[in-house]
């Protein structure tokens, strides 16, 4: 079984509990001992986020340390004075410059996994669109003017909306 199938099968098992999965406290290393550690971190982050995001039971994914070298270090740390900082697991370097993992996750979240588009209304049929869960700012332009509303698409909630322009200001 490939690693992807193995991870997904574990998510399936946890998903059977019927509670939302929160993937938290992620630390993917980028230290120099990995060769091009930042490329390793980028590739691992992209693969894992795609798996986690695609699973229906996943509700949240939380990266642990945003910036390298800022994790709390206990005096009796397992690897001297560095503690978790040894792994360089942040999405940003110590100087706040973006690492490749930041760039790939920013692209996934703000571009690939974002729904945007235009729908031309057809009075003769049910008008539909396909998008990710979340909030949608809707702008409707008619001969009578432009109207705005917000629609919420959430898991386990019916997603059929009727928009009455007479009730919008």
Where are these regions (language model features)?
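Aromatic-rich peripheral "rim/lid" segments of glycoside hydrolase catalytic domains that contact
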Residues: 2-22, 28-169
């Amino acid at each position: 079984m490939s690693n992807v199938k193995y991870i997904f099968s574990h998510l399936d098992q946890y998903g059977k509990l019927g509670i939302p999965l929160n993937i938290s406290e992620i630390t993917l290393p980028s230290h120099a001992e990995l060769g091009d550690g930042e490329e390793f971190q980028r590739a691992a982050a992209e693969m894992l986020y795609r798996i986690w995001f695609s699973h229906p039971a996943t509700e949240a994914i939380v990266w642990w340390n945003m910036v390298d070298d800022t994790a709390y270090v206990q005096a009796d740390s397992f690897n001297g004075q560095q503690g978790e900082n040894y792994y360089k697991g942040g999405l940003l370097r110590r100087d706040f410059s973006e690492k490749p993992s930041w760039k790939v996750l920013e692209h996934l979240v703000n571009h690939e996994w974002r729904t945007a588009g235009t729908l031309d209304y057809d009075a003769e049929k049910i008008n539909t669109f396909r998008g990710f869960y979340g909030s949608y700012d809707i702008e409707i332009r008619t001969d009578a003017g432009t109207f705005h509303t917000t629609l919420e698409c959430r898991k386990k909630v019916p997603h059929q909306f009727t928009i009455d322009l007479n009730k919008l200001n």
